[in-house]
Amino acid sequence: MASILNQTQELQEASKVLGHVRCENFFIFPGENTLSDGLRGVLYFLGLAYCFIGLSAITARFFKSMENVVKHSRKVVAIDPITKAEIITYKKVWNFTIADISLLAFGTSFPQISLATIDAIRNIGERYAGGLGPGTLVGSAAFDLFPIHAVCVVVPKAGELKKISDLGVWLVELVWSFWAYIWLYIILEVWSPNVITLVEALLTVLQYGLLLVHAYAQDKRWPYLSLPMSRGDRPEEWVPEEIDTSKDDNDNDVHDVYSDAAQEAVESGSRNIVDIFSIHSANNDTGITYHTVADTPPDSATKKGKAKNSSVFDIWKHQFVDAITLETSESKKVDSIYLRIANSFWQLLLAPWKLLFAFVPPCNIAHGWIAFIFSLLFISGVAFVVTRFTDLISCVTGINPYVIAFTALASGTSWPDLVASKIAAERQLTADSAIANITCSNSVNIYVGIGVPWLINTVYNYFAYREPLYIENAKGLSFSLLIFFATSVGCIVVLVLRRLIIGAELGGPRLWAWLTSAYFMMLWVVFVVLSSLKVSGVI
């Protein structure tokens, strides 16, 4: 994918109509460029909104597959020193802090990473960097920090409190996320302005590894590398038994694991279902923690996620059946004919996405890894379409490409972050994963999202030309970062105050939750307006 600025310049032709540069290219159908710019703008905005619906659907599938990956345990057999009997326990394969950074944050940031890396490989040998550009990354960071916090804070039910259980890990992740953008400013404005050297690219990528090590050290409370902070209260059970709400009179029906959003909400609303990404385990004297997981033995694990007498292929087949079914079991219970018609229309709107995403294998294959990888590929594909729509919106409307970069494009590439954090805020008992995904995604976008493409290009340019990589789309970076950090302070201060006064970062009294949400959205609007005025030359 070329830079948004380069793509917009390619899309704009020299012919002018009434003083406006006419966009001659098309994306949806041939002959599209013969339509008026106003009509095309409406079509592109509708297409962008439809892509957001698709991103929401596939991100939910991604989150479900990640649940299966993270909850995987391995059997540990020990001998009782007194009775000499075998004691079988199960130890979690994944550390939940590492899972938040390397699976959740990396996965939701995969659109930026994959598209930028493919662009770097496709344009290898170019002396100027392409990709999303620094402006989009700062805009994406602002979208992650403000609108996603605004959504997550109102997700818990009225009066329900969800707080960060490990403040030490959160502080480590927060510092690394802010440092990522300070580092971006240093290498683009101070160290070697508008130039990326091989050393700078290598150091950028290595810092992702340092983030993982430092966060893990804090989680394990390693001396000299961790903050002396205690953990908060955690649930007694890691994965409580789920209540099967899908049972009806016909026990032989295949369980609908590809259920609609309404059914998903009903099931996730039950407090008998808990996700376990960031509920950290306490250390014992030996430094090893064992968990007895009730659903890990082979017999029950095989049954989990599918009904009696059903197979994996039955479930996979049922995904396609559900994709073309307009009336669900839940909608049949609705008495109002108007609500049933509205639900059927919504299912019709979702049908193309559901049919496409039905190709994602069931999440209980290979502990969820295959579904995890398939989901990432689909997320990247939809994100690519988002970038094309945003390019064309800039082209037909004449909106400054930089404004599009840190608004529509940043929102599109960060949409999976929003959906994943919202689901985590709904289904987990703490706020750890929901907020960790915000801060860690911002880190991943810099250390990996542009670090890897820069490393690919700088290595080639160093050996081929003995030249560095040049950056030409860093306009307004200093000002945008200044506004970002200023508004970020306002966001973090409110989160801390909520912790001290209300007792949690998310939830609480409904009025205060909505006021906090409105405040976070106001900070985002301030960032967007001031950055837009700066790149437009108004201020």
Curated annotation (Swiss-Prot):
What biological-process terms (Gene Ontology) are attached?
Answer: metal ion transport; transmembrane transport
Q: A GO CC term?
A: vacuolar membrane
Q: Where in the cell is it found?
A: Vacuole membrane
Q: State where it is primarily located.
A: membrane
Going by the UniProt record, its keywords in alphabetical order are: Ion transport, Membrane, Transmembrane, Transmembrane helix, Transport, Vacuole
Looking at the UniProt entry, the stretches that span the membrane are 38-58, 98-118, 135-155, 167-187, 195-215, 341-361, 365-385, 392-412, 444-464, 477-497, 511-531
InterPro entries (alphabetical) = CaCA, NaCa_Exmemb, NCX_ion-bd_dom_sf
Let me know which tissues express this protein, per UniProt.
High expression in leaves (at protein level).
Recorded superkingdom: Eukaryota
Membrane topology summary = Multi-pass membrane protein
* Protein family: Belongs to the Ca(2+):cation antiporter (CaCA) (TC 2.A.19) family. MHX subfamily.
Q: What does this protein do?
A: Vacuolar transporter that exchanges protons with Mg(2+), Zn(2+) and Fe(2+) ions. May control the partitioning of Mg(2+) and Zn(2+) between plant organs. Could play a role in Zn(2+) accumulation or tolerance.
UniProt protein name: Magnesium/proton exchanger
Gene name?
A: MHX
